[in-house]
From Swiss-Prot:
Source organism per UniProt: Bacteroides thetaiotaomicron (strain ATCC 29148 / DSM 2079 / JCM 5827 / CCUG 10774 / NCTC 10582 / VPI-5482 / E50)
InterPro entries per UniProt: Asp/Orn_carbamoyltranf_P-bd (IPR006132), Asp/Orn_carbamoylTrfase (IPR006130), Asp/Orn_carbamoylTrfase_sf (IPR036901), Asp_carbamoyltransf (IPR002082), Asp_carbamoyltransf_Asp/Orn-bd (IPR006131)
UniProt pathway annotation: Pyrimidine metabolism; UMP biosynthesis via de novo pathway; (S)-dihydroorotate from bicarbonate: step 2/3
Subunit text: Heterododecamer (2C3:3R2) of six catalytic PyrB chains organized as two trimers (C3), and six regulatory PyrI chains organized as three dimers (R2).
SUPFAM superfamilies in UniProt: Aspartate/ornithine carbamoyltransferase
Protein name: Aspartate carbamoyltransferase catalytic subunit
Binding site for L-aspartate: K80, R162, R224
Gene: pyrB
């Protein structure tokens, strides 16, 4: 049987991305369905999560599925030395699909190769976060009316930020111009800049974060500096507040600008920005429900036509 796992957004074609966005739109019209009645969704979170875990579990519940899983690996047999493979094999015997977050880069790929059920990557270390990318794409499409020819500014932790890595790969189909704004310690890794060159993705690098630089942005994608990725806490303290978006910086930006953030926020967006109509990060998080309903259905073989023909409850 075809493995329908979602490990990286790089495996999605342009047509597939647009198909998934249309499916998310259907779920926004009515999120309450019974398309996954009788299915069991396992959520295995080896790292902390609020939005990703809760939105996947809410998506499963709204689709009629049951949810099992854990949020604290210390309370599981992995703390006794059980291997990831054994954990995956055991959970596969209980569930129809596994949503997994893990601290090791490549863990989702490995799980997809050993599991008899589909794996959805809910974040693997500093590597990829494809479900976040799907809701980011949906948010961009909703606010801009297109994914084509946009100026997208990625700000903050571009080294460890798996959300920006996935978004960059997904946007290769839509002729974006990226602006990478990061201190030298957190700049976009060379492998992703090489990816841009291989796919003719335009990008410009900055170390300064000013209102002049962001004046032409369509999307301003803020990220937090991730303390948990640093082995040297002195280095973290040095860079954690390097860029802070303040309301005054938005006065001369484009009318269509929207500010996105994968959340949680720490200090990188001042609270007075929340009331600015260009702030979209809380709506973005809400879009996660619809995008993840689409992901669960697609991975389990339910088509867009099935969703459109489903009786709304």
């Amino acid at each position: 049987m075809e493995n329908r796992s979602l490990v990286t957004i790089a495996e999605h074609s342009k047509e597939k991305i647009l198909y998934m966005l249309e499916m998310a739109k259907q779920f926004e019209m009515n999120p309450n369905r019974r398309l996954l009645q009788g299915k069991v969704v396992a959520t295995l979170f080896f790292e902390p999560s609020t939005r990703t875990r809760l939105s996947f579990e809410t998506a499963a519940n709204r689709l009629g599925a049951r949810v099992i899983g854990f949020t604290d690996p210390k309370a599981t047999s992995s703390s006794k030395g059980e291997t990831l493979k054994d954990t995956i094999m055991m959970v596969s015997s209980y569930a129809d699909i596994i949503v997994m977050r893990h601290y090791l880069e490549g863990a989702a790929r490995y799980a997809s190769e050993v599991a008899p059920v589909p794996i959805v990557n809910a974040g693997d270390g500093a590597n990829q976060h494809p479900s976040q990318t799907m809701l980011d794409l949906y948010s961009i499409y909703k606010t801009q009316g297109t994914l084509e020819n946009l100026n997208i500014f990625l700000v903050g932790d571009l080294k460890y930020g798996r959300t920006v890595h996935s978004l960059l790969m997904a946007m290769r189909h839509f002729n974006p111009t990226f602006h990478f704004i990061a201190p030298d310690e957190l700049k976009m890794p060379e492998e992703y800049k090489l990816y841009c060159k291989e796919h003719q993705i335009k990008y410009i690098e900055h170390t300064e974060f000013t209102e002049e630089i962001i004046a032409d942005a369509d999307i301003l994608y803020m990220t937090r500096v991730q303390r948990e990725r640093f082995t040297d806490l002195m280095e973290y303290e040095r860079v954690k507040n390097v860029y802070i978006l303040r309301n005054k910086m938005l006065e001369n930006t484009r009318p269509n600008l929207r500010i996105l953030h994968p959340l949680p926020r720490v200090n990188e967006i001042a609270y007075d920005v929340d009331n600015n109509p260009k702030a979209y990060y809380f709506q973005q998080a809400q879009n996660g429900l619809y995008a993840r309903e689409a992901i669960l259905c697609d991975v389990l073989g339910i088509t867009l036509e099935d969703v459109k023909n489903d009786i709304l409850l």
